Amino acid sequence: MTDKRKDGSGKLLYCSFCGKSQHEVRKLIAGPSVYICDECVDLCNDIIREEIKEVSPHRERSALPTPHEIRHHLDDYVIGQEPAKKVLAVAVYNHYKRLRNGDTSNGIELGKSNILLIGPTGSGKTLLAETLARFLDVPFTMADATTLTEAGYVGEDVENIIQKLLQKCDYDVQKAQRGIVYIDEIDKISRKSDNPSITRDVSGEGVQQALLKLIEGTIAAVPPQGGRKHPQQEFLQVDTSKILFICGGAFAGLDKVIGQRVNTGSGIGFGATVKGESEKATEGELLLQAEPEDLIKFGLIPEFIGRLPVVATLSELSEDALIQILKEPKNALTKQYQALFNLEGVELEFREEALNAIARKAMKRKTGARGLRSIVEGALLDTMYDLPSMDSVDKVVIDESVIAGQSKPLLIYGKPEAQASGE
């Protein structure tokens, strides 16, 4: 066969593994005295992929972090919200322990516990879900509940959520079935009243009904990569009972619903118990007392609430917490901008009074941690625009007056001898 693999004119080349000639395959790759065809390359890739799939479950089983380890990792990235972190750590640990033991333990079937996060805008709901998925090294996708509609109506079908998850892991069904799905703005699909309506509510109660089976566990048929381009391909079957669903929402007004229930026994008229301002529960304290009946009154259907048995409440972030968020986490906002300026060879300093001013401004806007970036971006915009065109800037200092818009950042120049010689 050696004479057939020579590169002389008129000589046919053959694959050293399967023996097919260069005319029988699409591509023949040459190596030192050997050749391999594209078909053999594909076969080798398939064999390697299968071996990786067989080995990976054992590696994951021994690497499952404990609730304490999960909580400790969340502390590195999320400031405050201690009760919510504890609830999440236990729920996530139990979920993946269940998956690693095949949904059963001593013949007892273990149910799935999806999670509902209740908390104001910018309190860290999305960040908690993202951090969990990154730490556990599982596929993660987000969906906005306000874009979802029932199948057959204009909008996004609920099964598109699973397709997005598959896209994140290159359509590997086994990986997708270990993933985490975060559905944001879940409070926006509450029905208009707590009484069943005879009219069709395709973006409220209708979406809740459509999400029921998906969250509880069903076999979702998802078109393969390419979708309608290859209609002859079989649909991918994804078991959603193995996917952890985390739903989050601000639930504005839920505190009033809880307050009505909690204060029912205070009476009216001369027998009423009058509470002073200091005795009244804050919004955060009321949300901690949320019960399924309150969520039903808010507009979630009982069946939907039943699929989200684990409820974690996040409180509104205080000014001190916002200051901590600016400087303490591993990926703190100030550290991100300092790294960005370092790429220009410039040191960036935020003075303590500047951090206080940023936090106060975010508190006034009522946007929580989410509003911090826009405030810092606004303060640094002109500097980031000019800096790449400037020479000899060693340091940029941000103080309170910069955040208030009363002055520009202080630029400290270096190399005075170079400037003097240039003159």
From Swiss-Prot:
Amino acids binding ATP: P120, T121, G122, S123, G124, K125, T126, L127
Keyword hit for Metal-binding: yes
Keywords: ATP-binding, Chaperone, Metal-binding, Nucleotide-binding, Zinc
Any single Gene Ontology cellular-component annotation: HslUV protease complex
GO MF term list: ATP binding; ATP hydrolysis activity; ATP-dependent protein folding chaperone; protein dimerization activity; unfolded protein binding; zinc ion binding
Binding site for Zn(2+): C15, C18, C37, C40
Keyword Zinc included in the entry's annotation: yes
Annotated Pfam families: AAA_2 (PF07724), ClpB_D2-small (PF10431), zf-C4_ClpX (PF06689)
Domain ClpX-type ZB: 2-56
GO biological process, alphabetically ordered: cell division; proteolysis involved in protein catabolic process
PROSITE patterns per UniProt: CLPX_ZB (PS51902)
Coiled coil: none
Quaternary structure (record): Component of the ClpX-ClpP complex. Forms a hexameric ring that, in the presence of ATP, binds to fourteen ClpP subunits assembled into a disk-like structure with a central cavity, resembling the structure of eukaryotic proteasomes.
Protein role: ATP-dependent specificity component of the Clp protease. It directs the protease to specific substrates. Can perform chaperone functions in the absence of ClpP.
Similarity section: Belongs to the ClpX chaperone family.
Listed name of the protein: ATP-dependent Clp protease ATP-binding subunit ClpX
Species per Swiss-Prot/TrEMBL record: Serratia proteamaculans (strain 568)
Gene name in the database record: clpX
